[in-house]
């Protein structure tokens, strides 16, 4: 079963403050609060937010390549064939004489002939059957086509059939959090977070007694925001260039390992808080009683999560109307080649006001590589048991 699911590590660097709001106003330190883990109270980027915006960016990536090559949906219906997939195949065959539609490229997956911008976001016509590809709502907007790589990879729901999708997103949790200190900016983390991300070195135990660990271990004391803590020793963490985002590289000497019990307190005390005010368009001055504050995950924060791709091509009994399914390689390419949109268009709220941009790094999980090597036959003994 493990061979059917491919996992990828996700490391994300916030290049702008990131605001994923909880909705509405609250009474407290700030008016607009951000999403937090209900157990640890540490801010995070929910997997639902990541999946939704990545779906949109995948659509943008595909349309940028096929916009002038894809047919109208009415042209597909004119093709011979009983099912929609047969009509698509016949249209592609008519185009392949000039190499217009190369299905080996993920941009030109068979079902992408029906892809529209509305395949991202909420379906406008969920009450229609999958075969009704020209259906529109009262505003004339189409819905999820149910045939393209995006619909099959991220999921869709129609009157006659629903599909879970093949890509599964975890939350992005904070791994390294930047804090100002007397020694400059340092990034705090915990042993538990290093374990979950696969970065924990051997010999590093949990810190206790409100002491922290640094690379040098000779600082005596260090301030993390308003907290003044004793340095209890050294850590042996070696990133070996694992946390690199183009020109940015996190160094071992920049990392401070703190007790799990203090991590939430330090993070929540050092979030970015931005004060905004509404402007009267007539006077050009601030409106009275229109001041509000918003908190955000600060620039420089590094987050960690994972994405699993579930290969359902080997399933028997999949309805014919769902075929063909994209393979894992095509879905992985789609994610990797569309993630650059996060660097320009961002994620979350207030992206037009200096928020939201992140850099994403995708890589295969180390344990999967080990498992692949473990399953390879041993050439020294003919592949038998040792």
Model-found features: residue ranges?
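RNA-binding basic/glycine-rich loop and surface signature characteristic of RAMP-family CRISPR effectors
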Residues: 1-386
């Amino acid at each position: 079963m493990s061979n059917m699911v491919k996992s990828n590590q996700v490391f994300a660097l916030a290049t702008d403050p990131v605001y994923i709001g909880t909705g509405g106003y609250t009474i407290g330190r700030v008016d607009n609060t951000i999403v937090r883990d209900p157990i640890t109270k540490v801010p995070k980027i929910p997997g639902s937010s990541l999946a939704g915006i990545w779906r949109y960016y995948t659509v943008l990536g595909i349309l940028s390549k096929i916009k002038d090559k894809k047919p109208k949906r009415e042209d597909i219906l004119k093709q011979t064939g009983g099912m929609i997939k047969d009509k698509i195949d016949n249209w592609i065959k008519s185009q392949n004489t000039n190499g217009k539609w190369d299905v080996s490229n993920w941009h030109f997956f068979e079902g992408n002939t029906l892809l529209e911008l509305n395949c991202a976001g909420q379906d406008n016509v969920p009450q229609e059957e999958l075969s009704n590809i020209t259906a529109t709502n009262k505003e004339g907007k189409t819905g999820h086509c149910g045939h393209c790589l995006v619909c099959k990879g991220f999921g869709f729901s129609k009157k006659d059939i629903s599909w879970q999708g093949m890509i599964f997103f975890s939350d992005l949790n904070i791994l390294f959090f930047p804090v100002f200190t007397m020694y400059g900016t340092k990034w705090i983390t915990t042993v538990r977070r290093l374990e979950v991300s696969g970065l924990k070195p051997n010999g590093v135990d949990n810190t206790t007694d409100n002491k922290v660990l640094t690379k040098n271990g000779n600082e005596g004391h260090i301030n993390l925001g308003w907290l003044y803590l004793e340095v209890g020793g050294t850590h042996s963490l070696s990133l070996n260039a694992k946390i690199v985002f183009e020109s940015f590289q996190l160094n071992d000497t920049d990392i401070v390992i703190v007790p799990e019990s203090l991590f939430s307190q330090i993070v929540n005390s050092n979030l970015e808080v931005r004060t905004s005010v509404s402007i009267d368009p007539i006077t050009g001055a601030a409106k009275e009683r229109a001041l509000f504050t918003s908190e955000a995950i600060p620039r420089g924060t590094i987050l960690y999560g994972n994405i699993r791709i579930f290969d359902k091509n080997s399933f028997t009994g999949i309805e014919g109307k769902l075929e063909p399914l994209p393979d894992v390689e095509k879905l992985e390419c789609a994610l990797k080649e569309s993630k650059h949109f996060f660097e320009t268009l961002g994620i979350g709220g207030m992206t037009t006001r200096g928020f939201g941009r992140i850099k994403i790094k995708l890589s295969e999980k180390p344990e999967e590589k080990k498992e692949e090597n473990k399953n390879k036959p041993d050439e020294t003994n003919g592949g038998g048991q040792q």
